[in-house]
């Protein structure tokens, strides 16, 4: 007879703690924050992936703040507007006027990679590049928050009442590109973002091996299901870490021309096939391989591809069926009836698979249709894809089950596209929040909008549900504009260029970098020195002799440029 097994109390305690934590996670998930989120895993899965040492993350407090900010804008029909910040100077200036901060992968790729090797936005930099920039800015936010608190607590109540308080702790949303590889790469990337201070992360549905800036050509999508896996990986990692990090799903389906796979039926209606029967058995890839074998390259291969594509008569399966129905030897009324029946069943929201489409077409009399989506595949094996707002809507429906915001990348600031996408996505997921890239890649002056319409663009699409809007590269362009124009003028006019363009403008606009020693925190660290040394320090940085005292005075400036001899100009005291 087998001996009975007595479960040690330690094992029971371990299980008890595990079950209690599972219950905590289930309660957390049932909160208002996650009422729209659907997870394909359980709370037990999450807790099993956690360690015993419970950790808290400052980014989680920022994530909660971001969520409150965005939901408030959504409720009010307004938008959080922001742009890509390059450095601590920009992030502290932005804090006075904007309620969120963006960290752009493009800007990091061109100005601040982990290897210091700049380049275009191809997501080929080390995957800690953007998290490192997030940490750079998040540390700066926290530092300037501490510095401000020390300064304010050194003031009298009357002085504090007259001194505006700046909330430097604005939530950061960061560019996660495509997740940088497979599931484990996405998991580790998201872990870095949480640890480095990101309140939100966006991940796009391009192929990670061919990723391009959203406004470059040659974009290749992954299947809907593959991008859902990326989003699930991100959400799972946030859950394991116990954070409410805001997840933004971006789709490049509007302008994409290729897709990696036809495995997901939701993509089938947008994949293009050959309808020219004379190309049966003559795939483009084999034709190009033959051309290379005989020594063709470059322009010659491009000519072969162009000629083949021009004769292929590429179209979606649905368009091919409609064309076949219209060619049938039937009365016009019967043709119209069958076309309408096809279009009714093949509506984009039904997401018919190709197999289902062929069955339906056969019932309508289209039994010998030649349509082949394998023949036009590229040399890399990609399928041809007909990008559109409709394709983006279909993806938006799928991604909204996991993500908190949906972002459709566009080629121009098209109000009709914005409306179509918003109405399409919200027809099935009415409470989802939307994001919009107010891209500097758009030639806004060529958009056909008046200045008034440009000014109204943000609030107008905010009313459609785009509650987070951002100029990805405004920090980069602002930096370039200021430095280029100043350098040009400085080369010509010397110090007068600096005084007129920089110093006086800082003074008149109340920009706190005018007193750059104070901005950098010299007073703050003097407080450390004095605290350590009993309240006094002979080596304080802001003591007697610091040149920044000049900016606290009111003075007269004789011989001002453009004024008569003997005149002077009174310059107002700087705003410190």
From Swiss-Prot:
Q: Give a short account of what the protein does.
A: Involved in storage lipid mobilization during the growth of higher plant seedling.
Q: Which reaction does it catalyse?
A: D-threo-isocitrate = glyoxylate + succinate
Instruction: Kindly list the organism's lineage.
Output: Eukaryota, Viridiplantae, Streptophyta, Embryophyta, Tracheophyta
List each coiled-coil range: none
This one is known as: Isocitrate lyase
Q: Where is the active site?
A: 213
A biological process term (GO) from this entry: glyoxylate cycle
Q: Where is this motif: Microbody targeting signal?
A: 574-576
Provide the alphabetized UniProt keywords: Glyoxylate bypass, Glyoxysome, Lyase, Magnesium, Metal-binding, Peroxisome, Tricarboxylic acid cycle
Q: Where does substrate bind?
A: 104-106, 214-215, 250, 437-441, 472
Task: Give the binding site residues for Mg(2+).
Answer: 175
Q: What class of enzyme is it?
A: lyase
The EC designation for this entry is: 4.1.3.1
Instruction: State its location(s).
Output: Glyoxysome
Identify the pathway: Carbohydrate metabolism; glyoxylate cycle; (S)-malate from isocitrate: step 1/2
List the InterPro entries. ICL/PEPM, Isocitrate_lyase, Isocitrate_lyase_ph_CS, Pyrv/PenolPyrv_kinase-like_dom, Pyrv_kinase-like_dom_sf
Q: Which organism is it from?
A: Brassica napus (Rape)
Q: Which GO terms describe its cellular component?
A: glyoxysome
Task: Look up the record and name the cofactor or cofactors this protein needs.
Answer: Mg(2+)
Subunit info here reads: Homotetramer.
């Amino acid at each position: 007879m087998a001996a009975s097994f007595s479960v040690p109390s330690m094992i029971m305690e371990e299980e008890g703690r595990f079950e209690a934590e599972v219950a905590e996670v289930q309660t957390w998930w049932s909160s208002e924050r996650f009422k729209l989120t659907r997870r394909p895993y359980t709370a037990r899965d999450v807790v099993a992936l956690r360690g015993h040492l419970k950790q808290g993350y400052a980014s989680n407090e920022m994530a909660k703040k971001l969520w409150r900010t965005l939901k408030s804008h959504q409720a009010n029909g307004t938008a959080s507007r922001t742009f890509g910040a390059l450095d601590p100077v920009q992030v502290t200036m932005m804090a006075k006027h904007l309620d969120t901060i963006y960290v752009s992968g493009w800007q990091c790729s061109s100005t601040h990679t982990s290897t210091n090797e700049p380049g275009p936005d191809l997501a080929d930099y080390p995957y800690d590049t953007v998290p490192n920039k997030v940490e750079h800015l998040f540390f700066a936010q926290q530092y300037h928050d501490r510095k401000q608190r020390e300064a304010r607590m050194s003031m009298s109540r009357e002085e504090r009442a007259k001194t505006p308080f700046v909330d430097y702790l604005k939530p950061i949303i960061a560019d996660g590109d495509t997740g940088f590889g497979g599931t484990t790469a996405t998991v580790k990337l998201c872990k870095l973002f949480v640890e480095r201070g990101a309140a939100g992360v966006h991940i796009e549905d391009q192929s990670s091996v061919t990723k391009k800036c959203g406004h470059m050509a040659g974009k290749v999508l992954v299947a809907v299901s593959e991008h859902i896996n990326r989003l699930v990986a991100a959400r799972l990692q946030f859950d394991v870490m116990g954070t409410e990090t805001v997840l933004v799903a971006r789709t490049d389906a509007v302008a994409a021309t290729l897709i990696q796979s036809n495995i997901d039926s939701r993509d089938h209606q947008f994949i293009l096939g050959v309808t020219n029967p004379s190309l049966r058995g003559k795939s483009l890839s084999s034709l190009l391989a033959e051309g290379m074998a005989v020594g063709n390259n470059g322009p010659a291969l491009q000519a072969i591809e162009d000629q083949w594509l021009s004769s292929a008569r590429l179209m979606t399966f649905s368009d091919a069926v409609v064309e076949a129905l219209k060619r049938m030897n039937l009365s016009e009324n019967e043709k119209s009836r069958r076309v309408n029946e096809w279009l009714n069943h093949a509506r984009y929201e039904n997401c018919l698979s190709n197999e289902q489409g062929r069955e339906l077409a056969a019932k309508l009399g289209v039994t010998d249709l030649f349509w082949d989506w394998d023949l036009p595949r590229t040399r890399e094996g990609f399928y041809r894809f007909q990008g559109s707002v409709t394709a983006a809507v279909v993806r938006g429906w799928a991604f909204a089950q996991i993500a908190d915001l949906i972002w459709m990348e566009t080629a121009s600031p098209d109000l009709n596209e914005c409306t179509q996408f918003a109405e399409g996505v919200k027809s099935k997921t009415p409470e989802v929040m939307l994001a919009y890239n107010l891209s500097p890649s758009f030639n806004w002056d060529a958009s056909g909008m008046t200045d008034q319409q440009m000014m109204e663009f943000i609030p107008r699409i905010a009313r459609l549900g785009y509650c987070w809007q951002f100029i990805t590269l405004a920090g980069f362009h602002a930096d370039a504009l200021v430095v280029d124009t100043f350098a040009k003028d400085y080369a010509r006019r010397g110090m007068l260029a600096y005084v007129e363009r920089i110093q006086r403008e800082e003074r008149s606009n109340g920009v706190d970098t005018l007193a750059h020693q104070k901005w950098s925190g010299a007073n703050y660290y003097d407080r450390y020195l004095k605290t350590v040394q009993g309240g006094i320090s002979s080596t304080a940085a802001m003591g007697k002799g610091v040149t920044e005292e000049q900016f606290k005075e009111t003075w007269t400036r004789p011989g001002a440029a453009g004024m008569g001899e003997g005149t002077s100009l009174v310059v107002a005291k700087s705003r410190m």
